[in-house]
Amino acid sequence: MSFNFTWPEFSAEFYEYAVQTLTTALNRGQKPKSIVGDIHVKGLHMGRVPPELEILEIGDLSRERFRGIFRFVYAGDAHLEFSTGVQANPLARGSEDHGIFSGPMTSRGMLFAASPLTVPMRVCLSDFKLRAIVVLVVSRTKGITLVFKNDPLESVKVSSTFDSVGVIQRYLQEEIEGQLREMFRADLPSIIHRLSQDWLRTESKEKVVPTPSAQPAKPAMPPVPSDVWPSHHTADVPLSVLALEEAAPSAYASHLTKLDTASQSSQGLKDLVQPAGSHPAGARTFHTTSRVRVPSSLESNAPPTPIALSSPGGLDVAGHLAELLRANHTLSPYTPHPRLVALRTMPAHRPRSSRVHARQKRAFHLS
């Protein structure tokens, strides 16, 4: 069984993200003492030569998950270029026996400068030779997991600003190879895993089609005129000057006459607005115990003078009706028929005969 792998031309977005991820990975953790600046990746190219893969084992093969063990061999033309700052003096290790400046001057503790000097350095890595056993797990939900079972780095070519100084060149070669081995062990698998998760997340967003909302639109509320009950007018007036429809102030006396007549009847003020027997189904009955305010449409320059009524039963008609019609909703803009508002109150107290009073107090005793 054989497979053909295509090594594509990677996009600019891939290179930009890979450069940012590599910069973060190279600056993570403890760097060598001679490197005093941050490491910035300046160039990255994956090359045109693909790696070689030999299938050793297929452990899981399905539409959602794949797991396999491969022998990975790479000897391509990929390269990586980065820059940083190094300390020119001392460029030495912790031990005097393995110092990079081995000679009589360093053995006596003599240095080339009296104070440390930071020098910019540019490094290019190329001619990678890798060989390893790779465990590859591909999941459509969790991404790609890549693990090297052994050290993959065989050799790498390090070119730097200090290639003319052989001692520094050998020191950089050893340090960079050590950092690359650590990167292949820990950093590269995490970078590939994050790249695969971002790719899967982008692919899932493209497949999701937004569905329109099925909730019905709420009907708009009718506008409330602001001039019906002015908020700045808080003076309460007796009901003797309140009309349920727009009328001239001269009509107040006729309304008061109706109030006085209705207060003496047995039905109370039930038929004040509309005669008995003609109430429609939409008529409303309000029970309230306070006073109301006059709408702005009934206000005039000179407020009318309240007219006091006297009833034989001791009922204060004006005060009692003022307690009946509290609430702005009595004549609010939402009242469907303001002229058909029915009012109910208790009839005036009438003295009852002694016979009726005695009949109500009659007690029955069972022997």
From Swiss-Prot:
SS bond list: none
One GO molecular-function entry: lipid binding
Domain SMP-LTD per the UniProt entry, residue ranges: 1-197
Segments of this protein annotated with the region Disordered: 267-311, 347-367
Quaternary structure and partners: Component of the ER-mitochondria encounter structure (ERMES) or MDM complex, composed of MMM1, MDM10, MDM12 and MDM34.
Compositionally skewed regions (Polar residues) per UniProt: 286-302
Identification of the protein by name: Mitochondrial distribution and morphology protein 34
One term under GO cellular component: ERMES complex
Lineage: Eukaryota, Fungi, Dikarya, Basidiomycota, Ustilaginomycotina
Membrane topology classification: Multi-pass membrane protein
Keyword check for Lyase: no
Alphabetical keyword list: Lipid transport, Lipid-binding, Membrane, Mitochondrion, Mitochondrion outer membrane, Transmembrane, Transmembrane beta strand, Transport
GO annotation terms (biological process): mitochondrial genome maintenance; mitochondrion-endoplasmic reticulum membrane tethering; phospholipid transport
Domain notes: Lacks alpha-helical transmembrane segments, suggesting that it resides in the membrane via beta-sheet conformations similar to those predicted for other outer membrane proteins and porin. The SMP-LTD domain is a barrel-like domain that can bind various types of glycerophospholipids in its interior and mediate their transfer between two adjacent bilayers.
Tree of life domain: Eukaryota
Stated family: Belongs to the MDM34 family.
Role of this protein: Component of the ERMES/MDM complex, which serves as a molecular tether to connect the endoplasmic reticulum (ER) and mitochondria. Components of this complex are involved in the control of mitochondrial shape and protein biogenesis, and function in nonvesicular lipid trafficking between the ER and mitochondria. MDM34 is required for the interaction of the ER-resident membrane protein MMM1 and the outer mitochondrial membrane-resident beta-barrel protein MDM10.
Compartment(s): Mitochondrion outer membrane
Gene giving rise to this polypeptide: MDM34
